[in-house]
Swiss-Prot record:
The active site is at H347. Residues 1-230 are annotated as: Pyrophosphorylase. This is Bifunctional protein GlmU. It comes from Maricaulis maris (strain MCS10). Mg(2+) binds at D105, N228.
Length: 452
């Protein structure tokens, strides 16, 4: 890469078809706002200068873009895509390199595809346009090429002849050119059209009028899927999940029922991991080799170390860390807690704000009582400790190495190493009580029945 690169991300659309109080480009695909996808793509393709163009109706976009480290430019009023790109000119620090126009509502374009667009410029094209061939070209603008395969013009559907409408190669909107040339051409774009707008696509015709070469780079249709509605959002999510499932399996992950497993944008899973059906991964998950995630589990912000097991019906929340060979079983929730090597939490348990030592065993129904209504408090369970079923651990509290808690104990004080904690009412027996109770109840029922 010999020339510097910049990226202009168009994010000023109103997105009314989403029917949402949330701005369209802040809706998420795979747990990540679409704007974040675009900014990450710009960075991945080597853009050192990124400008996000936002609209006056959506200051939340400006705030989000600035939080992501991009410059911002306001398009007000909105007068088309060409006008939006022009709005970014003052915010760009350097016009000496190449610039690419990306869209914040097109989240699935890969860095490899964008690299091919820049390669077209490096190969001698003055303008490079990203096109695709959808199953149904519908009303997309057609990319008309010449005999050499270069782009001759972009024809909007409403202006296309029958022969041009038969062309299957259409415009994605993504366009790259040397920045200085791009803005020079945009300065010549007029708005003599039904909408009175300035169209970025006119740049191609203006470049050809100067006898400059324009190239087409073809992408898969799934990559350039634009999101304008909830249905489009669902389609983008499905496309991402399909891509991720194939990638995971190609990298050595077993998915028993791939179509039922859902990943986040940043899920990291090592080889020889087995994922059973109906598992959902939120952001921030790292899974090491030989882990098994059983069916119907939900995992977010968690780290599962080598050989750990989770589920079925496990919920691992942010900050959960499962040590090597540890086990979290059915109907167990772990939050902001660390399980050391070989620890077992097999069923019906909540562990929050805690550390569980190596080879400790947590019995069914155990609860760490970590919240007093104002603050969270920590529970520490030592190595080889045994927590009896139905134990309540009232934090802050420590159970020492090798200590036991008796079933049903409410632990409110630290338990020394190798001690037994027992805190429950002594069991007493009342001889004959059950017979007397049953006789009284039956007599009462008989009297009531006789009165009806």
């Amino acid at each position: 890469m010999s020339r510097s690169r910049s990226a202009i991300i168009l994010a000023a659309g109103q997105g009314t078809r989403m029917k949402s109080k949330t701005v369209k480009v802040l809706h998420k695909v795979a747990g990540r706002p679409m704007l974040d996808w675009a900014v990450a793509l710009a960075g991945d393709c080597g853009a050192s200068d990124i400008v996000t163009v936002w609209g006056a109706h959506s200051p939340a976009v400006r705030d989000a873009a600035e939080a992501l480290g991009t410059r911002t430019a306001l398009q007000d009023p909105p007068k088309g895509t060409g006008h939006a790109v022009l709005a970014a000119r003052a915010a760009l620090a350097d016009l000496s390199g190449d610039a690419i126009v990306l869209y914040a509502d097109t989240p699935l374009i890969t860095a490899a595809t964008v690299a091919r667009v820049f390669e077209a410029l490096e190969g001698g094209a003055s303008v490079a346009v990203l096109g695709f061939e959808p199953d149904d070209p519908a009303a997309y603008g057609r990319l008309i090429t010449n005999e050499a395969g270069d782009l001759d013009r972009i024809v909007e559907f409403k202006d296309a002849s029958e022969a041009e409408r038969a062309v299957g190669l259409v415009n994605s909107g993504v366009l790259a050119a040397p920045a200085e040339l791009l803005f020079d051409l945009l300065g010549e774009v007029g708005n003599d059209n039904a909408n009175g707008e300035y169209y970025l696509t006119d740049v191609v015709g203006l470049a050809r009028a100067r006898d400059l070469r324009a190239a087409v780079v073809v992408a898969d249709a799934d990559e350039v899927l634009g999101v304008n509605s909830r249905a489009d959002l669902a389609e983008a999510e499905a496309a991402f999940q399909s891509r991720m499932r194939q990638s995971m399996m190609a990298d050595g992950v077993t998915l028993i029922a791939p179509e039922t497993v859902f990943f986040a944008h940043d899920t990291q899973i090592a080889r020889d991991v087995v994922i059973e059906p109906n598992v959902v991964f939120g952001p921030g998950v790292v899974i090491e080799e030989d882990v098994v995630v059983h069916a119907h589990s939900h995992i977010a912000g968690a780290h599962l170390k080598r050989g750990a097991h989770a589920g079925p019906f496990a919920r691992l929340r942010p900050g959960a860390e499962l040590g090597e060979g540890s086990k979290v079983g059915n109907f167990v929730e772990i939050k902001k807690s660390q399980l050391a090597e070989g620890a077992k939490v097999s069923h019906l348990t909540y562990i929050g704000d805690a550390s569980v030592g190596a080879n400790a065993n947590i019995g069914a129904g155990t609860i760490t009582c970590n919240y007093d209504g104002y603050d969270k408090h920590r529970t520490v369970i030592g190595d080889n400790a045994f927590i009896g079923s139905n134990t309540c651990l009232v934090a802050p509290v420590t159970v020492g190495d090798g200590a036991f808690t008796a079933t049903g104990t409410i632990v409110t004080q630290d338990v020394p190493a190798d001690a037994l904690a027992l805190a429950r009412t002594p069991q007493t027996h009342k001889p004959g009580w059950a017979a007397r109770f049953n006789a009284a109840k039956q007599a009462r029922k008989a009297r009531k029945d006789s009165q009806t």
